[in-house]
From Swiss-Prot:
SUPFAM superfamilies: ALDH-like
Keyword Cytoplasm: yes
Coarse class of the protein's main subcellular location: cytoplasm
GO biological process: L-proline biosynthetic process
Pfam families, sorted: Aldedh
Keyword presence, Cytoplasm: yes
E.C. number(s) listed in UniProt: 1.2.1.41
InterPro entries for this protein: Ald_DH/histidinol_DH, Ald_DH_C, Ald_DH_N, Aldehyde_DH_dom, G-glutamylP_reductase_CS, Glu-5-SA_DH, GPR_dom
Stated name of the protein: Gamma-glutamyl phosphate reductase
Enzyme class: oxidoreductase
């Protein structure tokens, strides 16, 4: 961690303020947190023109600096995108309270009762790149789950992020929740020093490039939730419905290619390759997708030859690698070798083949006959997502409120002592009670 600076006194002061506000926030009730979220949404609506003007400034500056097209797409915030993000804040307000949920209720002995109850994590630190809508998503989930949040967006979106945070804090100031529960970090030094705030920050969630995520994972003692790559695959089986497969494949790549849940490699069963590609090539061309294929797919019309590097590349662009495979096992072997355990899709009308794929592929999301783009917290009904995790341990996949809470054991007794159980004068009953 030699490359990570020590936190400044100013950063420590802000982190302590967020921590203190989080303690109070964790003790608010469901109604108070819902009111806070509605106030945040109202403030965002009132300041929409200011936020969009700030975003235009960011876009103009970033275009002049030569920001990559994929990042420009993520950076852009228009009326529709902003309205959807604000609606997402209101939807989070209407979600069931994730706190105080009793997960275990057990009588250990008469008068000695154990409960396991959901509680906030405390403070989350979120580092993300050119995604100004992420500020609204993360802040709403943090407040709903009773957590404070330190947020650091990419410098590309600095004007937008500041305008959004001003609105969010104004909303909190008019609510039962302290505005100190949210803080925006604005410099690279602060984002690096955040990694040293173990003791004040309970979880770090990186949202961005492979390099960003891996750097954070390698340079902090704080637990990290996230994924480093989004190399997603779609396999067209021999028993696929060609018209359906073309429609789903094109959507999975082109609906929003800069997203981590867009497919990067198309695997096609050799026996269906000729008729499928005959239908798919013009559809991909119409969507602006450039294909890079193995020798066999090039022979069937794919314009450009793929290299070994293409199989492991997250393009985040209108580029798709294509490979023909012998069977389901060859497809799943390729996915295991090159995939990032994010989201994988099979297109087939054979239910048994689909079940084998869903069981064999160890990714956070495995889909049958639908677009990979459904891998999203909002589409899952989570209201929004704080990030996507490809780790094996939970939370996994799109992470909503449930990923921002932990649990606490509460034991209530009447003067019970362990010595009475050690000498046999008392005996555990271990009777489960209704939740």
């Amino acid at each position: 961690m030699s490359s990570v600076p020590e936190p400044s006194a100013a950063l420590l002061q802000r982190a302590v303020a967020v921590r203190r506000a989080a303690v109070d926030l964790g003790q608010t009730d469901d109604g108070q947190r819902a009111l806070a979220l509605q106030a945040m949404a109202d403030a965002l609506t009132e300041r929409a023109a200011t936020i969009l003007a700030a975003n235009r400034e960011d876009l103009e500056r970033s275009a002049g600096e030569g920001l990559a097209p994929a990042l420009m797409a993520r950076l852009k915030l228009d009326d529709t995108k902003l309205a959807a993000a604000i609606d997402g804040v209101r939807k989070v307000a209407s979600l069931s309270d994730p706190l105080g949920c009793r997960q275990l209720h057990r009588e250990l002995d008469q008068g000695l009762v154990l409960e396991r109850v959901s509680v906030p994590l405390g403070v989350v630190g979120v580092i993300f790149e050119a995604r100004p809508d992420a500020v609204m998503q993360i802040a709403s989930l943090a407040i709903r789950s009773g957590n404070g949040a330190l947020l650091k967006g990419g410098s590309e979106a600095r004007c937008t992020n500041e305008a959004v945070m001003d609105a969010l804090q104004a909303g909190l100031a008019a609510s039962p929740v302290s505005a100190d529960a949210l803080a925006l970090l604005t410099t690279r030094q602060e984002s690096l020093a955040l990694l040293r705030l173990d003791g004040l920050v309970d979880l770090i969630i990186p949202r961005g490039s492979n390099e960003l995520v891996r750097f954070i994972q390698d340079n902090t003692r704080i637990p990290v939730l996230g994924h480093a790559d989004g190399v997603c695959h779609l396999y067209v089986d021999a028993a696929a419905d060609i018209a359906k497969a073309v429609r789903v494949a094109v959507d999975s790549k082109s609906q929003y290619p800069a997203a981590c849940n867009a497919i990067e490699t198309l695997l096609v069963h050799r026996s269906i390759a000729q008729p499928f590609l005959a239908a798919a090539l013009p559809a991909f061309a119409a969507a602006g997708v450039k294909l890079r294929g193995d020798a066999e797919s090039v022979a069937l019309g794919v314009a450009e030859a793929a290299t070994e590097e293409d199989w492991s590349t997250e393009y985040l662009d209108l580029i798709l690698a294509v490979k023909l495979v012998d069977d389901l096992e060859a497809a799943t072997d390729h996915i295991r070798s090159y995939g990032s355990r994010h989201t994988e899709v099979i297109l087939t009308e054979d239910a048994q083949t689909a079940d084998r794929f869903l069981a064999a592929v160890d990714s956070a999301g495995v889909y049958h006959n639908c677009s990979s783009r459904f891998a999203d917290g909002f589409r899952y009904g989570f209201g929004a997502e704080v990030g996507i995790s490809t780790q094996t341990l939970p939370p996994r996949g799109p992470v909503g409120l449930e990923g921002l809470v932990t649990y606490r054991y509460r034991l209530r007794g009447e003067g019970h002592i362990t010595a009475d159980y050690a000498n046999g004068s008392c005996v555990f009953t271990h009777i489960d009670r209704p939740l």
